[in-house]
């Protein structure tokens, strides 16, 4: 079967890989000049299978109001002039109940744990290098109330058999020795030993090469202008420079999935949530993180690659703009300098921003649409890297008409149309 994948980020390229593995003739198109040039370019680097948590959570509305008055808020709202922004926020608020949180968390953990297994199989098959470190995630809490609030997440971890360990402040240095210098700033910690880190952009570039070896065709600098369909069947996707016919189409366009598929009267509840990152060279390995440290207070992750530190996080609801305000840079610099003051050189840091495709319930959209040959693999929010291989394998199995290895019926767009 000829399958066309829209989007060459980590979701699209991973989908292409598994579709090619299944024997399909695969073509990928993207508006950028290469793979992983947008959301996948400089994300936080976490493969946080255990730390898979919905943004829509009990208490978030109250926290969001308090954050408005902080000098370095983890969440920032800027009106973008659209009614849709308000509608999306309202949908998200409706998911901030304890019942919805548990349902959404379970879906997310299910995908993430499956993705962990897919990474295990993939690495055994390919031996790919993407600066991966399998040394876990350390979530640190600066306040006692944050430690107490984490018990809700721990209950879900136990339900899914995800290994974890509660830590006293001084125990955090067992996993991140450099934190011994700042123990007084920590109220407690949670260690997830099965998590990992890795460079998403490097991974996608290497996977792109493997896909090419399997015969996958890539066409870059292709901006989609029209989707040609006959009733509920997609015939072709037209760009400014070509026409791509296919038996099946997979949409993995991240935040732009909504705008592109709007012409088909498909209402994808995706909003672009802007995030930021700094990438700085390691100057003192003893003073740098070993793996990923997640600062719960600032919602910022500090991740170690081979010779670099990636500091990423925050959430800004401001539409599709990707400006780089100095205030956001200051927040990232503050957090890494506060916890790892001797680890890297901030004067050489590269500042970046990207748009995460977030759904109101934080769960991605995977599977069928009302169009018989149009499939989705999008809306992963902050967890596109973590969920990449799991989501892609689910998508490939659904496109191929195979039974999926885990439950997937509650991941499709239909959950918003009931």
UniProtKB/Swiss-Prot annotation:
Assigned GO CC terms: cytoplasm; plasma membrane
Biological processes per GO annotation: D-alanine catabolic process
Named cofactor requirement(s): FAD
GO MF entries: D-amino-acid dehydrogenase activity
Pathway: Amino-acid degradation; D-alanine degradation; NH(3) and pyruvate from D-alanine: step 1/1
One Pfam family matching this protein: DAO
UniProt protein name: D-amino acid dehydrogenase
């Amino acid at each position: 079967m000829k399958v066309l994948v829209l989007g060459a980020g980590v979701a699209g390229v991973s989908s292409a890989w598994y579709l090619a593995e299944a024997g399909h003739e695969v073509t990928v198109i993207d508006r950028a000049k290469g793979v992983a040039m947008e959301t996948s370019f400089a994300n936080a680097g976490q493969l946080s299978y255990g730390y898979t948590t919905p943004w829509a959570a009990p208490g978030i509305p109250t926290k969001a109001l308090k954050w408005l008055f902080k000098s370095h808020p983890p969440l920032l709202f800027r009106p973008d002039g659209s009614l849709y922004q308000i509608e999306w926020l309202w949908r998200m608020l409706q998911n901030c109940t304890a019942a919805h949180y548990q349902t959404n968390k379970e879906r997310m953990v299910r995908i993430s744990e499956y993705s962990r297994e897919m990474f295990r199989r993939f690495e055994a098959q390919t031996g790919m290098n993407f600066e991966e470190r399998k040394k876990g995630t350390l979530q640190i809490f600066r306040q006692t109330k944050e430690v107490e609030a984490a018990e809700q997440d721990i209950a879900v971890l136990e339900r899914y058999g995800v290994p974890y360990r509660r830590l006293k402040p001084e125990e955090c240095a067992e996993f991140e020795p450099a934190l011994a210098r700042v123990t007084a700033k920590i109220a407690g910690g949670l260690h997830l030993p099965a998590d990992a880190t890795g460079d998403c952009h490097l991974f996608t570039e290497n996977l792109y090469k493997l896909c090419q070896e399997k015969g996958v065709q890539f066409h870059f600098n292709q901006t989609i202008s029209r989707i040609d369909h006959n009733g509920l069947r997609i015939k072709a996707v037209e760009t400014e420079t070509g026409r791509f016919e296919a038996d099946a189409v997979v949409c993995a366009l991240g935040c732009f999935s909504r705008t592109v598929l709007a012409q088909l009267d498909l209402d994808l509840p995706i909003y672009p949530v802007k995030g930021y990152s700094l990438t700085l060279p390691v100057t003192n390995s003893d003073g740098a993180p070993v793996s990923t440290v997640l600062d719960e207070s600032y919602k910022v992750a500090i991740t170690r690659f081979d010779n670099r530190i990636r500091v990423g996080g925050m959430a800004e609801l401001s539409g599709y703009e990707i400006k780089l305000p100095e205030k956001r840079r200051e927040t990232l610099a503050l957090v890494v300098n506060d916890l790892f003051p001797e680890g890297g050189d901030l004067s050489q840091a590269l500042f970046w921003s990207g748009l995460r495709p977030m759904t109101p319930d934080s769960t991605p959209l995977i599977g069928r649409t009302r169009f018989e040959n149009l499939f989705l693999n999008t809306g992963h929010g902050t967890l596109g890297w973590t969920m990449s291989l799991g989501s892609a394998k689910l998508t490939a199995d659904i496109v191929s008409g195979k039974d999926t290895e885990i439950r997937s019926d509650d991941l499709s767009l239909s959950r918003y149309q009931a």
